[in-house]
Amino acid sequence: MSDIIHLLPDHIANQIAAGEVIQRPASVVKELVENAVDAGASNIQVNIKDAGKTLIQVIDDGKGMSETDARMAFERHATSKISTAEDLFSLHTMGFRGEALASIAAVAHIELRTRARGTELGTCLSIAGSNLESIEPEACNEGSIFSVKNLFFNVPARRKFLKSNETEFRNIINEFERIALVNPQVGMSLYHNDAEIFNLPESGLRQRIINIYGKSLNQKLLSLDAQSSMVTISGFVGRPDSAKKRGALQFFFVNGRYMKHPYFHKAIMQAYEQLIPAGDMPNYFVYFTLDPSSIDVNIHPTKTEIKFENEQPIWQILMAATREALAKSSAIPTIDFDVEDAIDIPVYNPVKKSEPSTYKAPKVQVDSSYNPFDTTSYKKPEFDWSKLYQGFENDRVAVQRESETFEDAPIEELPAEASDPEKLFTEVSNPCYQYKGRYIVTSLKSGLAIIDQHRAHVRILFDQYLSNIRQQQGVSQQVLFPEIVEFTAAEAAVLPSLLEDLCFVGFDLSNLGNDNYAINGLPAGIENLDPVNLVKDIVDRAIETGCAVHEKICEAIALSLAKAAAIRPGKSLSLEEMDHLIASLFSCSDSNLTPDGKTIISMLTDEELERRFKC
């Protein structure tokens, strides 16, 4: 039997390795920009064409490379960062494996121009698919210019699975922002198709955050600071009133490296417990500085998952530091334990005889006619108890207001027809009762139905808004004073794909430049809602769901509008409103579930009722 095991050629091995390290254009940006930071650059410029599919160019003024180093940099496991295995536990650089450039060169065309500091002549090198095509001396500036073209040109399967330009560019922005947040001492700029996206000068951390995410964030940040022999924690956390359901800015960095850490995230969330509504997420920018030997970053290809030797103590320190930051801002009420339990007794202050005394002795009312041995001699109460029951027979709706903080939103009428009008009329013609301002109880042919009024209205409005988008029949209500909404670069990148559908549903937006838009008109029926937060929520939902298909984008817009405009728990409804809500619900495409899969109706069948009363 002949031997069947053989070594793979280097170019195939590099393509396999590239599958882990280089997953999309954003991966190339991350690796090249981190290399520029490691090279000591004070200014880094990133130029992108077609979301990185055509060109990714990174220009830095770092220390550059010699001709030999430039050639060696593209060999597998060639690095200047480490020399021994022990160096893995004393890392102070972003890269160390020597895989990135070799992986990029395996799946793209690369042109490198570089000149080391103190030398007169630089080097120009060209590589395509791991093959060195040319290398020659060239006059160029100090530093390096990496130009990556035609990414995945020789791996068509990988290129086919790339997302839309909007999605891929948004991922590039995310990687750029993470590196910019941890290196405020480095000036950084980003251009896409020759349009400036970021121009971040060297600055402090707070100013860098503001330059990236907008001036409105400045007043919402609270300083975070904790120092111990184990770890130093710094950065910022957001005020509780800035928390939101989606699109929160949440970043962890350790020793200058971005990481994901669900366990530490729970520490932050515990500090915000009872300060923000359930489901809301706060902003935070948390930086850990600790001994490199106490962490392990070499456990994931992208180095975003990191193991900590002292995870539990750091968790406690982080939670305590966050609570302290919130307490200093009066977000957490402080308690004076010395006086909290003291009885509040007025202090005796004697007055002079010449001054009139304000003290009045308490009076005790005595019923002189009361005889304990005569049960008929005491006075009867003058209150007419029968008044308690006035109107009881006519009060068919029991309402307990659980919240008065929500704006009343009118129930929108859905112009849809029931699939079986006769059956629908029979089912909803029964009496309705409202329980705790949240549920509608009514009887159907199959039993007793308990309907969540908010979720039911979400389903009704969702179908209506989605129909308006599809039929391009949205009605717009122009506003007297346009609202200005400021988007981040990531939000602005996805907004163009939403504008047409936003227009169909009734929004009127105009571009003011610099990622700012004016809201000139709103969909009819939502005038009482905050238009800025509503538009931001729609964009955040589109980013969160990664909408690339047109239908998914339409659904994301319709769902955001429906959730914002639907009636809230605690809203009292009349019998006519409840009847109309139920009739509209059963006219929907799916009356059992909300668009995001939550239950609307809970049924209690006749059989279940009978079984409960058998005992």
UniProtKB/Swiss-Prot annotation:
<dbReference type="GO" id="GO:0005524">
    <property type="term" value="F:ATP binding"/>
</dbReference>
<dbReference type="InterPro" id="IPR042121">
    <property type="entry name" value="MutL_C_regsub"/>
</dbReference>
<dbReference type="Pfam" id="PF08676">
    <property type="entry name" value="MutL_C"/>
</dbReference>
<dbReference type="GO" id="GO:0006298">
    <property type="term" value="P:mismatch repair"/>
</dbReference>
<dbReference type="Pfam" id="PF01119">
    <property type="entry name" value="DNA_mis_repair"/>
</dbReference>
<keyword id="KW-0227">DNA damage</keyword>
<protein>
    <recommendedName>
        <fullName>DNA mismatch repair protein MutL</fullName>
    </recommendedName>
</protein>
<dbReference type="InterPro" id="IPR036890">
    <property type="entry name" value="HATPase_C_sf"/>
</dbReference>
<dbReference type="InterPro" id="IPR020667">
    <property type="entry name" value="DNA_mismatch_repair_MutL"/>
</dbReference>
<dbReference type="InterPro" id="IPR002099">
    <property type="entry name" value="MutL/Mlh/PMS"/>
</dbReference>
<dbReference type="GO" id="GO:0016887">
    <property type="term" value="F:ATP hydrolysis activity"/>
</dbReference>
<dbReference type="InterPro" id="IPR020568">
    <property type="entry name" value="Ribosomal_Su5_D2-typ_SF"/>
</dbReference>
<dbReference type="InterPro" id="IPR014790">
    <property type="entry name" value="MutL_C"/>
</dbReference>
<dbReference type="InterPro" id="IPR042120">
    <property type="entry name" value="MutL_C_dimsub"/>
</dbReference>
<dbReference type="InterPro" id="IPR037198">
    <property type="entry name" value="MutL_C_sf"/>
</dbReference>
<dbReference type="GO" id="GO:0032300">
    <property type="term" value="C:mismatch repair complex"/>
</dbReference>
<dbReference type="Pfam" id="PF13589">
    <property type="entry name" value="HATPase_c_3"/>
</dbReference>
<dbReference type="InterPro" id="IPR038973">
    <property type="entry name" value="MutL/Mlh/Pms-like"/>
</dbReference>
<dbReference type="InterPro" id="IPR014762">
    <property type="entry name" value="DNA_mismatch_repair_CS"/>
</dbReference>
<keyword id="KW-0234">DNA repair</keyword>
<dbReference type="InterPro" id="IPR014721">
    <property type="entry name" value="Ribsml_uS5_D2-typ_fold_subgr"/>
</dbReference>
<dbReference type="GO" id="GO:0030983">
    <property type="term" value="F:mismatched DNA binding"/>
</dbReference>
<dbReference type="GO" id="GO:0140664">
    <property type="term" value="F:ATP-dependent DNA damage sensor activity"/>
</dbReference>
<comment type="function">
    <text>This protein is involved in the repair of mismatches in DNA. It is required for dam-dependent methyl-directed DNA mismatch repair. May act as a 'molecular matchmaker', a protein that promotes the formation of a stable complex between two or more DNA-binding proteins in an ATP-dependent manner without itself being part of a final effector complex.</text>
</comment>
<dbReference type="InterPro" id="IPR013507">
    <property type="entry name" value="DNA_mismatch_S5_2-like"/>
</dbReference>
<comment type="similarity">
    <text>Belongs to the DNA mismatch repair MutL/HexB family.</text>
</comment>
